[in-house]
Amino acid sequence: MKIELDMHTHTLASGHAFSTIQEMAKAGAEKGLKLLGITEHTPGIPGTCDPIYFRNLHVVPRQMYGIDLMLGAEINILDGKGTLDADEALMKKLDIRIAGIHLLCYEHGAVEENTYGMVQAIRHPYIQIISHPGDGTAKLNFEPMVLAAKECGTLLEINNSSLKPARGKVDARSNNLEILRLCKQYEVPVILGSDAHISFDIANYQYIYELLQETEFPEDLIVNRSVEVFMNSLKKI
């Protein structure tokens, strides 16, 4: 399958990643991508950049080495109410807005509470992609999540990093298989994300491809196959 984009990556600015914007852009171009998303963590993650970083993104060129860039954030879902750790003023400054649950800053609840919070994030007018919903950090009911994504036009990510054996996320494989089967059933598009924290890992979808094959997931529901398909699928702000 041809891949033209990767929308979930991190640079040094996130505090625990290892490449610069230029290094990420160059690596993406060398891999033949046409579009790269750089999505730094918001303040709920220790060591990440301050909000002023996002307000100054206007100084960064949106094309380097022949590849287009979209600069944004991976915003934290904090609790079962769907509270986010970025305000509207910050989100307006971004090219792309992802939201996800992270162990370091999530207030865990029962499955029903976690699912409600996730659905609220999916319905948020500024959130365009949900990162690694299947990584098992919070227990979720996936069917309401998939149906909300279909209703709101928010893309659900299948995340390669969470599937790596070294990450130790024991439920990630079965969870992502369930999400893919539900998205196939309800004809909900997905986005593949590398979650690269170093340039060499950009557009690495090795473990995702195994799940796509196992579920016989339709290529026409994978938005990474072309920039045009992705942009047409992206929730408009």
Segments from the language model and where they lie:
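Extended substrate/RNA-proximal surfaces in nucleic-acid metabolism proteins
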Residues: K2, T42, G47-I158, S162, ...
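N-terminal active-site segment of His-dependent metallophosphoesterases
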Residues: M1-K31
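Extended recognition/assembly regions associated with phosphoester-bond processing machinery
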Residues: L5, K34-L35, P46-G47
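Histidine/acidic-residue-rich catalytic or RNA/ligand-binding cores of hydrolases
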Residues: G15-S19, T48-P51, K139-V146, A166-L182, ...
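Alpha-helical scaffold segments that flank or form the walls of functional sites
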Residues: Q22-L36, N56-Q63
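Short acidic/histidine-rich active-site segments
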Residues: V188-I202
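Histidine-centered catalytic micro-motifs
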Residues: E4-S14, I38-H41, I130-G134, S194
